[in-house]
């Protein structure tokens, strides 16, 4: 499922401010008159503006939107100036480069933002971001494959949907609360076993073994169109919302005693545990909940319709 976030909450409040003095001092006349030349020297090509690096005597650069645009363009000549920033007191708190024409994030070496959105850019290499203290990072629809540069970051939200990421090992021990990995070629999720994830999206991932989720304090998990067959690792957890539509799951028995309030599943695939599903304290139940639509109903409507369909199918 493609997220439609507004860079909560840090990037959702981007304020474009203009700081600093644009006034220029008049140039003083030269102390010595220039010597005459025989012929006019050919015009020299102006070099690209140098990046705004801190001077040795300075503790840090006082950033403005203008200097940030210059810094980004220095490393990305094709940059179109579309970035948005949240800058407070000369410090870049958050920036959104969603859809921008950038391939190089070396500009990140001189700033310490808490939230960054690089979604829908051709970015592939995150090494210049190594050691940053990001809390939110959005990489959806990028070419990023290797997450090792973000190892050790205090990330709470990470969105990887539709990237070629296969390995989540770099996320081990992160304080992640939300992980969106829709459409990634991920088969092994053991790297998140010790993360305090509450919201997890794995739609269209080829993952089959979800044993790692037994130790994760999930509130909501989407396993839509995965290869998951066995729900036993979820048994006894505090999970409230579960989406297992279009999966090879056939047995709902492991859900017994759980406090689920929403269940999305494929009834035609279920051969055991329907009675367990009927005993759950569900508020919503359905067979579809994705970008294409949803058909959630209260149990009082869903189960009579389900029973009628089963009875009709049983008639010769």
Regions found by a protein language model. Give the residues of each.
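Surface-exposed cap/linker segments adjacent to membranes
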Residues: 52-79
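Short, low-complexity, disordered segments immediately C-terminal to signal peptides
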Residues: 20-39, 45
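C-terminal motif of bacterial Sec signal peptides marking the signal peptidase cleavage site
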Residues: 15-18
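Concave beta-strand-loop units of leucine-rich repeat
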Residues: 74-103, 112-124, 128, 132-145, ...
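Bacterial N-terminal signal peptides that target proteins for export
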Residues: 1-7
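Sec-dependent N-terminal signal peptides
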Residues: 7-13
């Amino acid at each position: 499922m493609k997220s439609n976030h507004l860079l909560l909450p840090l990037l959702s409040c981007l304020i474009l401010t203009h700081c600093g003095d644009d006034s220029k001092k008049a140039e003083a006349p030269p102390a010595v008159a220039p010597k005459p030349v025989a012929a006019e020297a050919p015009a020299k090509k102006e070099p690209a503006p140098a990046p705004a690096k801190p001077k040795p005597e300075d503790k840090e650069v006082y950033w403005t939107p203008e200097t940030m645009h210059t810094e980004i363009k220095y490393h990305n000549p094709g940059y179109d100036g579309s970035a948005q920033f949240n800058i407070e007191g000369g410090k870049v708190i958050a920036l959104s480069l969603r859809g921008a024409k950038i391939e190089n994030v070396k500009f990140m070496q001189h700033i310490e933002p808490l939230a960054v959105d690089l979604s829908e850019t051709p970015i592939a290499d995150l090494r210049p971001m190594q050691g940053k203290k990001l809390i939110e990072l959005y990489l959806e629809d990028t070419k990023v494959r290797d997450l090792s540069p973000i190892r050790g970051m205090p990330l709470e939200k990470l969105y990887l949907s539709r990237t070629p990421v296969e390995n989540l090992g770099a996320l081990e021990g992160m304080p992640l609360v939300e992980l969106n990995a829709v459409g990634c070629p991920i088969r092994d999720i053991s790297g998140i076993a010790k993360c305090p994830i509450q919201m997890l999206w794995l739609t269209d991932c080829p993952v089959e073994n979800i044993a790692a989720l037994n130790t994760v304090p999930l509130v909501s998990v989407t396993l839509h169109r995965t290869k998951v067959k066995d729900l036993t690792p979820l048994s006894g957890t505090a999970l409230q919302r579960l989406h297992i539509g279009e999966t090879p799951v056939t047995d709902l028995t492991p859900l017994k005693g759980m406090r689920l309030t929403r269940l999305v599943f494929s009834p035609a695939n279920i051969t055991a545990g329907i009675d367990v599903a009927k005993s759950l304290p569900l508020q919503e139940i359905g067979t579809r909940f994705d970008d294409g639509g949803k058909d959630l109903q209260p149990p009082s409507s869903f189960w009579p319709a389900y029973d009628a369909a089963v009875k009709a199918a049983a008639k010769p």
